[in-house]
């Protein structure tokens, strides 16, 4: 498990500079038999190819999570995805484009949602909770509102319930 400290902002547009990478992301969530939400995510970019990641997050405090993450094979990802469509499973789905911008030792991840929302959210993972973010020029003019720790803006909350009643 690793500690993840991040800040999240609603932005009015994508930055007007060229990103370092762009990913197509699809995420599936389901609540396991212990009542814990699990996530499987697939990333695809021309630079990095395909990646499949399984994650369980536990909220520690506002903007701070413990994260248990490991890589999946495509077959394991497909099995997870298929489980989300089984009868009686509480499951959710979201898809988005992620635009990645390096900023010194940090990186901004700007997500443009495809799943029915006209919403763009920027996140930055920081080394500690007291870290003073210096907004780079490309982010200064587009940030509208900080939403760190507001549950309604978590990816899982923004995801769409899978209708798996067969």
Q: What is the meaning of each model-derived region?
A:
Residues 1-166:
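Phosphate-end processing signature that detects enzymes handling 5′-triphosphorylated RNA
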